[in-house]
Amino acid sequence: NQRLLPYHEELKKAGACFGVSGEYERPMWYALNNEKPEYEYSFDYQNWYSSVEFETKNTITNVGLYELSPFSKYEIKGEIAHSELQRICTANIKNEVGRSTYTQMLNEAGGIEADLTVICIGENYFRIISSSATRTHDKAHIIKHISPDLEFKDITDDLICLGIFGPKSRNLISK
């Protein structure tokens, strides 16, 4: 009963070995050199170690593309969206289109309730991305702590999410 990504077949052809995260079947690693993209469990060296090592080294030295679509995604809109996010987030949230801010939301005792990224889509219009594992919790926490005057929408299943990481990521994005 897992959900498939819109480009599932392309990932499969690229050698993806799939696992489940947040209701989605998503790539966990990619097989190298025509190996089978399947887990071979062992108490010894795992068959996927070389693939993950390759991906990690490439990302650290170059650029890596990661499938993050199961991550939770929300939109908040309204006249006071920026001020509400400023109030409930630990970082300074910029109300500037295109700006993204990594931040947390705390509880009354100062403990971390949510670990997320806030992106300004338009004036007083924000997208929030958080972990797939904490979707229900984060959604409830945000709704509980923002004004009911704001428009809140869970858009997790509406959008894909790709992460581009590494020292050459800005060069790739600028092309």
Describe the role of every protein-language-model region:
Residues 1-175:
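Glycine/proline-enriched, intrinsically flexible loops and inter-domain linkers
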